[in-house]
Amino acid sequence: PFSHALEKVLIPGLHHETLSLLIMEHLNEHFNGQLSTAIAIFTGTYPKPFLHQLISGQLDVDRMDYLNRDSFFTGVAEGVIGYDRILKMLTVKDGQLMVEEKAIFSIEKFLISRRLMYWQVYLHKTVVSAEMSVVLIFKRVLELLQKGVPVQAASTDLDFFLQNREAGAAIKQHLDRFCRLDDHDVMASIKNWCHHPDKVLSTLSRLVTERKLLKIRFLKEPIAASRLTELRKETALRLTISEAEAAYFVFTGKASNTTYNPKDERIHILFKDGTVKDISEVDNALINYGSSLAFGEISKEYICYPQAQ
């Protein structure tokens, strides 16, 4: 539910790709091994590496799909890429996925579009505020449950994972439960928690359901600890909660994104003479080693705090 936002909250330590593999293996047993090839491609053990690179790599079809799709639904034109040309220019050499040199500019446009979409959509300050609010709601729920305070989710499946934190270690036994979860389980629970006697939980839940999100401000430099403490004291007084509880409403964080790092996975350009270069090593490269686009994640510190009444 809620994609990556709750990934580390519902089942700590379980990456979504690990969960995907467990589901595929479960289905493979049900279909008597018919997914064995698909699993080998997914895990990168299939003898043709380019197939894995097509579904999990710098130029995988998922990235091409979500950039155009999200660009359309959000109205942010910068995410539109010429995926059809990129697909036509894809080729294979020595089992590795490569791109013909004619598509260099299309690849550079793809990388720049991804960078712009992250800062204009995925890491937009309103998105960050909403996501952090939902995460903190579940953090508070887990804290209350640990203290013995009753908190019930709107569905038995979500309730199961919140009440049984050890279930994540035995997730293979509970895949059916997990696969029944969706965004509705989460939102229905948050609506119910708007009326919970715990003030922190009910207030956070109302912020989300009523769309009165925490204000967020990106900072040029980290905020002083004394100033953060001061803001929490002010919030504690205004909401009549403790200073420790005010940390749920006044907190700092960091939004980060890396456009392209050849140390992770490379985008190989195949030239007519048969030579192969990384996209960052071509002549007059837009994505080059000296550019902030190539290396080093771009990070922005932020602070969240309640809106003035």
PLM region descriptions:
Residues 2-309:
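Histidine-centered, transition-metal-coordinating active-site segments
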